Amino acid sequence: EGAYVKEPITGLHKWVVSFDLNSLYPHLIMQYNLSPETLLKSKHQDITVDDMLKGIKLNIPDKTTMTPNGALFRTDKKGFLPTMMEELYNERVTYKKKMLSAQQEFENTKDNKYKKLISRYNNIQMARKISLNSAYGAIGNQYFRYYDKAIAEGITKSGQLSIRWIENRLNKYLNNILKTDDDYVIASDTDSVYLTMDKLVTKTIKSDNALSKTINFLDKVASESIEPYITKSYDEL
């Protein structure tokens, strides 16, 4: 199975905000320690994404992780694949920061030397991004030396769990605030969710002519309330 794509709630929606899971598949590889040499060959448990969403008690041995396809991975030793993902991700973060810094220097000085640095750092961080995103494709390629269907499926099923988990949690969060029982996630796709914040805006912003005020309000809610809540929710998962 591939990624989870929610059937969109059709119609015209006001005040839509989106939240992305940063480098989802590489982070899942790191989170579950997914690698050919960490995969346990014991019989996989009969488990589904729905079971995990319902909070069914899992029988997971010590020092192991289990993906939603029932595959087990040892955690007493870090696999080569998550190690590689971590190194590539850290390098990308470093060069992306350098690129942004060079962009700021160019804005301040208009010195063309920073244009070359911007291009160089951007090329490096994009190369790291492509390498990160290729890991899942490689592990799911039957002609790849380390091909393993259980690992590839473990990645996509874990992605399904992650996006559906946060969809449920965000709906719970907004319904609790607004005292409603609605579906505020109008769409989700692989690693992104789209929320309609119209009812929250209507309840909070009273002025008829408050476009900038509303945008600032939503920016603040997203950064100071929803993003920390998303982080906390994934810690619980």
Where are these regions (language model features)?
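Conserved acidic
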Residues: 1-237
